[in-house]
Amino acid sequence: MNAQAASPAAVSQTGPYFCEMPSDPCAIIMFGASGDLARRKLMPALYDLAFHSCLAPSFRLLGFARTKMSDDDFRKSAGEFLPKGQEEGADDAKKSEFLKNLQYFTGDYDDAAAFQNLAKRLEELDKEGGLGGNRLFYLATPPEVYTHVIQQLRQANLTKSKGDKSWTRIIIEKPFGRDLASAKALNAKVLEAFDESQVYRIDHYLGKETVQNMLVFRFGNGIFEPLWNRNYIDSVQITAAESLGVERRAAFYETAGAMRDMIQSHVLQLTSLVAMEAPARFDATSVRNEKIKVLQSMRPFTTESVWKDVVRGQYGPGQINGKPVPGYRQEPGVKPASSTDTFAALKLHVDNWRWSGVPFYLRSGKRLAQPHTEVAILFKRAPHMVFRGENTETNSLVLNIQPEEGISLSFGAKTPGSQMLIRPVEMDFQYKNTFGASSRPAYATLINDCIRGDATLFDRADSVEAAWALVDPILNTWAGAAAPPFPNYPAGSDGPRAADDLTGADGRHWRPL
């Protein structure tokens, strides 16, 4: 994530994102290459980088998985998820050029001989493509095999850079542990094999343009930062809503739930970006130092505050877009009496000078009314209301993260006519309208940053552990008590009634989905 100004002319000529020069040539070794994440998300992201000349033409992608297939089969499988027809990037010549750089390697994740052979193959790729020994390992496997892969890479002497001018890095997908103890154990295993500077713990939400733009919006403009504190802000709401159910992830979701899957990672990462202080410099160390300070300033949950300030829910049967959908307990692979949370909401306090007394309301859930992720900054009312009765809405600044990325500011304005009637209006900025095209896929942004050695948007070990330290008391309290009467919200709704009570007890209300 390089910080530099681009002129309007440059943006209009090159599109909303471009690379002035390709990255270093490298080998990308993708573990779990036959899985859904690799095929549906990572391959399109890598192709996007190649299409926009962000990858060196000589890059090599080596897929590693247990599934047996040939190089051609692997290329065919990857090609099924690349742009087609009128989609942006649907260029047959460029797709063919991209796919020819893909190769496949069959092996078990705990097979030492397979990793020795992998090391030999990488030496061959270095010579074949002039890659200079640069290697990016990507763990797109189930989390239970992370330590197996890392141990085998270490034993095969693949975790250290080959020389002063080469680099070796590893991207690790979430979930990074399932509680504080397991996160610490995994960090210890990773750091036995790699230096922290080599490790890129990925959270794809942080690759979205609006999320990155929070930093520019706050610290690159002189308008809003003076208001970004307890003197002017009444509350903050962060919503990550999905209309989808668990799809094919029931086995994983039964062991996770909304609190582990979304709140601990995506939502707390957004919160730290909203609440952080200005970094001394815009580099990975400075930004991540400020984020960890926020996480460490969050008020710990006690058993009492969990029951008061945290809500969990599970969806029942309902309708999405006018079509009936089953409840969570009726989904294939889910236990008939499952107590897994598909919705979580909480009130959070950041105990520092900037945010003292400002509640942060966080929520995330599946099978909600609309797929929508946003950060809403709700400002305090004017100290003296000269105009009464017409404009009942507070001023708000909303950063829309998905599905449509953009920023909107709402305020009161007089309606035309002789009477002093006031209604809320909005000023909107949308990426596609301003820049004329969709923003870069989040995974493409993050992979590109990793190849270029920029860790700004990736988690550090201490921030992962701090997030788990906050969430652990909630999970432990839930584990020691019976779940609420599930299901407690129908699919297609805004969530359980108890979530409305969470804000209602403070005289506030959630923004509608």
Per-region residue spans from a language model:
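Secretory/organelle targeting and membrane-embedding segments
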Residues: 1-172, 176-513
